Amino acid sequence: MATIEFSPGIPEVPTQVRLLKSKTGKRGSAIFRFEELKSDTQSILGMRMIDEEGELTTRNIKAKFLNGEFKALEVIYDMETEAEWERFLRFMERFSAANQMGMA
């Protein structure tokens, strides 16, 4: 089963995921938005995407606040090669199937 975690053992589901790819097709990014978290936002150091192939990680995380109140986390996962892009897509296929998410 594919999961996303900020804290070990606490699965999270993003509110939105956007995919971007360069014109050359070599580089890409996935931008995750999380508006409701189970994890304590004070202890988040990175995001882990875990499935049967292993683990993908990123530490590119930005918290969004409005009038001092937490609104969302924005996480960016960058892919530098076609192999990284393909690996990420395999993870997202598993994750979306496990969490009843669709593509728009």
Curated annotation (Swiss-Prot):
Report membrane topology: Peripheral membrane protein
Pfam families per the record? Psb28
Give the chief site where it resides: membrane
Compartments in which it is found: Cellular thylakoid membrane
Could you name the Gene Ontology cellular component terms for this entry? Answer: photosystem II oxygen evolving complex; plasma membrane-derived thylakoid membrane
> Using the chain's own numbering, where are the disulfide bonds?
none
Q: Name one GO biological process term.
A: photosynthesis
- Report keywords, A-Z: Membrane, Photosynthesis, Photosystem II, Thylakoid
Q: Subunit structure, briefly?
A: Part of the photosystem II complex.
Q: Which HAMAP family match?
A: PSII_Psb28
Family per similarity comment:
Belongs to the Psb28 family.
Provide the protein name.
Answer: Photosystem II reaction center Psb28 protein
